[in-house]
Design a protein with these regions (language model features):
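FIC/Doc superfamily catalytic core
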Residues: 1-195
Length: 195
């Protein structure tokens, strides 16, 4: 399968500049390489419970650790527009608003930790702050948030989320519903994967 074959609802991989390993020629190889890289972040953040201060620096650091052996731009906000996400000029401001909103939700306590994690996940996907890996990044940040708050972890069907059809279509529909302000579908979808 060619590397540039695009998956519906994903950032297209038309631009491979910044790809660190030079032996990768297919999307399958890229997915395997990235999964190995992401595992390092999972081990760092989900190995033992710790307090997490979610701020801009930390949000960039998580992405950097997830992709630092795969992409030169790991942990750096994108600097052009793609088919998904806010205009790249708005990324920094939107990320600041997200951090502020999360602090408000935590202080206000009108939303459960689970509902906060779903909104955090959704907003990161909607902003799409990085060139690629935003879905996996958003799910991991949400998992870290849950774990730090003594909540059960989610077991995402990552392979199924890479393939068009079934679960991926349900996931995208749930995200699109959240885009319109209704988090019910995304919460129901996410609940299916609680450990």
């Amino acid at each position: 399968m060619p590397l540039i074959e695009n998956v519906p609802g994903a950032t297209p991989l038309d631009d491979l500049s910044g790809l660190i390993p030079d032996h990768i020629t297919t999307r399958e190889q890229l997915n395997e390489w990235e999964a190995s890289n992401i595992l390092q972040a999972v081990k760092k953040y989900l190995n033992r419970r710790r307090e997490v201060e979610i701020n801009l620096r930390w949000l960039k650091e998580v992405h950097r650790i997830m992709f630092n052996e795969t992409w030169e731009w790991a942990g750096k906000f994108r600097q052009k527009n793609y088919n998904l996400g806010v205009d790249w000029h708005q990324i920094l401001e939107q990320m600041k608003v997200l951090v502020d909103d999360l602090q408000h939700w935590q202080a206000d306590r009108s939303l459960s930790i689970f509902s906060q994690s779903v909104r955090l996940h959704h907003r990161l996907v909607k902003i799409h702050p990085f060139v690629n890996g935003n879905g996996r990044y958003s799910r991991l940040v949400s998992d870290i948030f849950l774990f730090a708050n003594n909540q059960p972890l989610l077991v995402w069907p990552d392979k199924d989320l890479f393939v068009a059809g079934g679960i991926r279509e349900q996931y995208i529909a749930a995200l699109q519903s959240a885009d319109k302000g209704s988090f019910k579908l995304l919460e129901e979808f996410t609940t299916r994967f609680i450990k």
